[in-house]
């Protein structure tokens, strides 16, 4: 009896692994919904309806977050662990280089995030997704819906959810003290030109991560 249970579990796990499609190249488009429930317009309200388009090619990813305020692009090389931020707001353009330690510091709130899984499912962008609850060291929680049908080779572009056994197609985040939700509108496996991950050679003011932190504190 014990052997049959072990065998059944092995078959189930094997079926899950082999049914997953590894995303080595493609594009995922997420829409952002923010509801401050406040009659007075807030900064977060301006982000409602923003989009985050993620381009993946092997170890490389490029996330373009576009709102009425401007565009912020995050380019990650998962081999070197180096990250570049391109910020275009109000006519100003900045290119910020982050070393691996800088990227870890930026996302330190998600260190040691743990997930619990619930038997709650829904379809997002054509994929069956399971509900998970992420819990941070601070005690803060957030809801994620992920699919085990897809698994990116590079999951650094979604730092908070990178330990999930699949791709998050809907997830909560915090903007200020308000909850916001990213939901995937589409997933495609179209080829992505390698030039998409080239860094601009002009037009941007290049600053370090430390300089960007000082600018934010001023």
Question: Could you tell me what each predicted segment is?
Answer:
Residues 1-23:
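Bacterial Sec-dependent N-terminal signal peptides
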Residues 21-218:
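Extended soluble regions of mature proteins
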